[in-house]
Amino acid sequence: MQTDYTQTIIDTINKIFSMLFSSLDLSIYSLLDKTVFINSSIVNDRFFSLAFNSSFGLSIIANALLAGFLIYYCFKLYMAPFSGSYVEKPYQFLTKVLIIAICISFSQFLCSEFLSIIDILTDILKSFGMQLTGKEISFNTLLSSSTYVIENSNNFNFFSFDGILKSFFSFGLINLLFSYSIRYILIKILILLFPFALLSLVTTSTSWIFKSWFRTFFSLIFVQIFIIFVLILLFSLNINTSDIFSQISYISTIFILTKSNSYIKELLGGISTDLNYNILNFKNLFK
């Protein structure tokens, strides 16, 4: 009996991808909801409490640097009559330094409150979406109700149209996980840099650092608002397995989710967390 090697190879490929995608699809949703919908809990853990409030924490370091700026200002003010250079009025400068020092001392609290406001807005939009679609707006719901979640079975055919759509869906989820994990880490880094971003406001020549920090931080946070609207649209689609257009529209919406940070970056500025974009930049370093 002659063995059909072509069919054996196809069956092996189908089995490998079926096992890979099913294992990822069943465990990925909890990570996505955690990394996408960020709230104040990201700031209020033990690590950030030590980083901001310890005896040699970020707030102490930033305030020490602020004191250095104050000494420099006093020296510059003293030398102003001899150099003829413009110096900010002492009352204005000291008032600004006092406000900045207070903000630096409460930088963890300010970040926590800002994220709490975003979390409240997120919950309001989720409730609005649930009223429209009748479904909880989350990636958990997306995976539990999707017909494109691949199960570990012999029915999966990677080379069929349905298999291609399911593969795009699974690859999209993998891309989402890496992109939003990068975003999650970047937000943590920006929170750690917040005291020094506030410090840059002490002079007009360095104030652009804070503006750049805030634009980047806000654009990364605003991504989750954009994602909610995309998920609402996704859950409102009536997917019919016999309608190719509705299926392609569904997969296209998943693609939009993977590019959400790029769209917000074009709108508000900031940095990209797109996995393909960062891999391309990394490869360009070695050219």
Regions of interest found by a model, annotated:
Residues W213-I221, S252-F255:
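Transmembrane helix-bundle signature of multi-pass membrane transporters/permeases
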Residues L198-R215, S236-I239, E266-L267, I271:
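Alpha-helical transmembrane segments
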Residues M1-L65:
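Binding/recognition "hotspot" determinant
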Residues L280-K287:
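Cytosolic juxtamembrane regulatory segments of multi-pass membrane proteins
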Residues I9, I13, L20, L24, ...:
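Non-cytosolic segments of integral membrane proteins
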Residues L65-A101, L193-S207:
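Hydrophobic transmembrane alpha-helix segments characteristic of membrane transport
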Residues Q2-F17, K89-S105, F210-K211, F217, ...:
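Alpha-helical transmembrane segments and their helix-start/interface "positive-inside/aromatic belt" motifs
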